[in-house]
């Protein structure tokens, strides 16, 4: 019986940990100052399966849907606007360490998004 419980725990642990890890940035807000060409503080509002980016005045710049698989974020913009890259999926590795979040580019045909996210350091924003 102990062996069955051990193997069940061993088998289920990666599934549970993966789910918890994937949940780690959902329903959070992150801010960073982005220099040229924006020269503004941006806030990424990450919800359950979508996100949106606002500037310091609260103006929505981009809306996106996303999926998380392990430490990989796949993002796809929708809607219209100056900063939207419709039909262009971007993939980023992300690392959350407490109140800090960092993105590393895997691949993204959207130059503006890649420039903004790749290597950027975000701090958890207070609500």
For the regions a language model picked out, list residue spans one by one.
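Bacterial Sec-dependent N-terminal signal peptides
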Residues: 1-25
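Sequence-pattern detector for short linear motifs
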Residues: 5-6, 99, 127
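N-terminal helix-cap/turn-to-beta initiation motif at the start of protein domains
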Residues: 17-31, 43-47, 119-127
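Contiguous, well-ordered beta-strand patches that form the walls/edges
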Residues: 33-41, 53-110
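Short, flexible N-terminal segments of the mature chain
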Residues: 47-53
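Beta-sandwich strand segments
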Residues: 113-115
């Amino acid at each position: 019986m102990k062996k069955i419980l051990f193997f069940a725990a061993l088998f289920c642990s990666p599934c549970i940990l993966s789910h918890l890890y994937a949940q780690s940035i959902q329903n959070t807000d992150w801010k960073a100052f982005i220099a040229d060409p924006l020269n503004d503080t941006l806030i990424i509002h990450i919800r359950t399966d979508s996100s949106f980016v606002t500037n310091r005045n609260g103006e929505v710049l981009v809306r996106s849907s996303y999926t998380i698989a392990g430490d990989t974020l796949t993002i796809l913009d929708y809607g219209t606007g100056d900063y939207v890259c419709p039909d262009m999926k971007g993939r980023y590795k992300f690392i959350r360490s407490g109140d800090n979040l960092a993105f590393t580019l895997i691949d993204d045909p959207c130059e503006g998004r890649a420039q903004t996210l790749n290597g950027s350091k975000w701090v958890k924003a207070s609500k």
